[in-house]
């Protein structure tokens, strides 16, 4: 019982899961690609073969990629929403010329959709860059030792900053 005298529910509170992304869309494909990079970065971080000099950068890359994936999924759902709205507008107005105001609204939605998808593509490219850089450094350090790649290990931090910035800007753009 709580202070109001009512019994508390015995079932746990369930948080609604976000809706699934529309199948067969570019945005769903981009999020799936990010899932692949997150999975591989997780495996890389746990790899016994990962040189010690890359342990911290690998953890940071994984955390950044997971955060990027979360932002990308929210943005992809926003693109799905725009796709749904555009589909409905076209289905209802089929064969009719839109009014100037409706045409302007449709143009804004298409423009926003295009900008969000371009930002998703760029964000994925940033994750790819960090991932491949870590793989390259891991191979190089395995072959030549830690003394040869100090500056390059530091450059991973810079790439991570660029990645975080790209997804921070994407999140702001999606909120507009």
Model-derived features: where do they sit?
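Soluble C-terminal extramembrane regulatory/interaction domains of multi-pass membrane proteins
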Residues: 81-176
């Amino acid at each position: 019982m709580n202070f109001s005298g009512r019994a508390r529910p015995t079932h746990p509170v369930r948080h609604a899961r976000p809706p699934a992304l529309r199948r067969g869309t570019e945005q769903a494909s981009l999020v799936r690609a990010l899932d692949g990079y997150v999975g591989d970065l997780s495996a890389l971080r746990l790899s016994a073969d990962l040189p010690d000099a890359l342990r911290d950068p690998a953890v940071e890359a994984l955390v950044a990629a997971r955060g990027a994936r979360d932002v990308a999924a929210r943005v992809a759902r926003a693109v799905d929403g725009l796709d749904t709205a555009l589909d409905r507008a076209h289905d209802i107005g089929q064969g009719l010329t839109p009014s100037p105001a409706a045409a302007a609204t449709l143009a804004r939605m298409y423009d926003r959709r295009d900008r969000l998808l371009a930002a998703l593509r760029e964000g994925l490219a940033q994750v790819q860059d960090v991932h491949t850089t870590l793989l390259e450094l891991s191979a190089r350090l395995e072959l030549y030792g830690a003394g040869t790649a100090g500056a390059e290990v530091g450059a991973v931090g810079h790439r991570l900053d660029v990645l975080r910035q790209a997804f921070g800007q994407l999140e702001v753009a999606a909120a507009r």
